[in-house]
Amino acid sequence: MDFSSNVAAQLNAGTILPEGIVIVTLLLVLIVDLIGGRKVALALPYLAIAGLLVSVGLLVTSWSMADPIGFIGAFNGDNLSIIFRAIIALSTVVTILMSVRYVQQTGTSLAEFIAILLTATLGGMFLSAANELVMVFISLEMLSISSYLMTGYMKRDPRSNEAALKYLLIGASSSAIFLYGLSLLYGLSGGETQLVLIAEKLVNADTVGQSLGLAIALVFVIAGIAFKISAVPFHQWTPDVYEGSPTPVVAFLSVGSKAAGFAVAIRLLVTAFGGITDEWHVIFTALAVLSMVLGNVVALAQTSMKRMLAYSSIGQAGFVMIGLVAGSEDGYASMVFYMLIYLFMNLGAFSCIILFTLRTGSDQISDYAGLYHKDPLLTLGLSICLLSLGGIPPLAGFFGKIYIFWAGWQSGLYGLVLLGLVTSVVSIYYYIRVVKMMVVKEPQEMSEVIKNYPAIKWNLPGMRPLQVGIVATLVATSLAGILANPLFNLATDSVVSTKMLQTALQQTGETPAIAISHDLP
């Protein structure tokens, strides 16, 4: 009995109960599809969404868990991981809502698509809480391989096949580099796999050989992370994959996959590389500069909506990295807050783009000319999301950027913040260009696509979930601007109550900062 109790205490399996619900949901989707076939196909999205919402509910109830460590230290269900896991699960909910009609129209299996998407969700959720090298890599591969499959899911579309091949080849190389970095950590720490134990062993790495090995490990690990978050110069896959992949997949990659990447970045860098904080701050400063400049400048010249949003996501990653480089409570909290609102405004934009694509079959920005005259509600929804991404007040994106810039300014990153402000203004131009094209064009200047714009039919199978997704993301984007302070307090609480971050801040001499919202006028 004592042995069983000891094993149960060490496993602490309750920490992965939200992921367990997702696993059960995944199995139910496959079993129900196998038994019911096409008769139950339309019920599967609702089954998956119900399971994901239950998982999010369990994440909420596990906030500030007394003992968040599970599976003998491999899983850390602290508040920081809870909020990132919730972001990933919610991004999957919206992705399912927007994908029902899209997948059905292509004639492919909806159940298989949902199953692969849930597998990617599991990988992202486990990655966000991974506290051990083996779990970090296995979770990353679960997310990556599922993403490759979703990217090439439209087998009859040559662009989807090309995107999947590019993503697979570059992603496999990135994973190999990342794994080599992890193997160096394992060797330098004397065979430890838990991040905390690795940090304890490496804190005294004072020999030349150990320091050089740790520097090489840092470079390789950052290369793997930078690929996942689409940071320049590891962004080459992003525009082509975004343009060729199914749009719902692009939406998930831009939010869920990116959130998982930033979650593992914080956990790995702050813990395992806590002894060389200055070094990785320098590297991420360079990545942030390159991402903000290239992402926002190249987006100006794009003619494809998905390709424009691909470069936009690269620029957005650069903004988030300012919070990471700040290395303070406010910096980490601003990262979490920005990912929370980015979830809704970016997925809202993709939901509107999917609706436009379903009606017209076009992805070209020029084809949006005059959309207001045929579909004012879609124009309003897409405009709100794009303006929020650009950081126009009083929308949510404005508060997200101002919190990140303020955190960077407090940490002395004056040049980085000023560059962020300049590139943010540049981004406003290409967002407003689309809005102006939709709204300002005279009726006689409408594109041929808009002139032949079909009437909407919400009674078609799969259209109602898309409608719910659009309305939900628009409402959330609008309310997030009004409720910015409570959301930021939530993000701050996730940082303040996370032992890993507090330990790192004490070691680097950072004093807990006052919440940004209190300093703003």
Curated annotation (Swiss-Prot):
GO molecular function, one term: quinone binding
GO cellular component entries: plasma membrane-derived thylakoid membrane
EC main group: translocase
Parts of the chain that traverse the membrane: 16-36, 40-60, 80-100, 110-130, 133-153, 168-188, 212-232, 246-266, 280-300, 308-328, 336-356, 380-400, 402-422, 468-488
GO biological process terms held by the UniProt record: ATP synthesis coupled electron transport; photosynthesis, light reaction
EC number: 7.1.1.-
Source organism, top-level taxon: Bacteria
Membrane association type: Multi-pass membrane protein
Major location (coarse): membrane
Subcellular location: Cellular thylakoid membrane
Pfam families in UniProt: Ndh2_N, Proton_antipo_M
Keywords: Membrane, NAD, NADP, Plastoquinone, Quinone, Thylakoid, Translocase, Transmembrane, Transmembrane helix, Transport
Catalyzed chemical reaction(s): a plastoquinone + NADH + (n+1) H(+)(in) = a plastoquinol + NAD(+) + n H(+)(out); a plastoquinone + NADPH + (n+1) H(+)(in) = a plastoquinol + NADP(+) + n H(+)(out)
Family: Belongs to the complex I subunit 2 family.
Function comment: NDH-1 shuttles electrons from an unknown electron donor, via FMN and iron-sulfur (Fe-S) centers, to quinones in the respiratory and/or the photosynthetic chain. The immediate electron acceptor for the enzyme in this species is believed to be plastoquinone. Couples the redox reaction to proton translocation, and thus conserves the redox energy in a proton gradient. Cyanobacterial NDH-1 also plays a role in inorganic carbon-concentration.
Assembly information from the UniProt record: NDH-1 can be composed of about 15 different subunits; different subcomplexes with different compositions have been identified which probably have different functions.
PANTHER family registered for this protein in UniProt: NADH DEHYDROGENASE
UniProt protein name: NAD(P)H-quinone oxidoreductase subunit 2
Lineage: Bacteria, Bacillati, Cyanobacteriota, Cyanophyceae, Synechococcales
Encoding gene, per UniProt annotation: ndhB
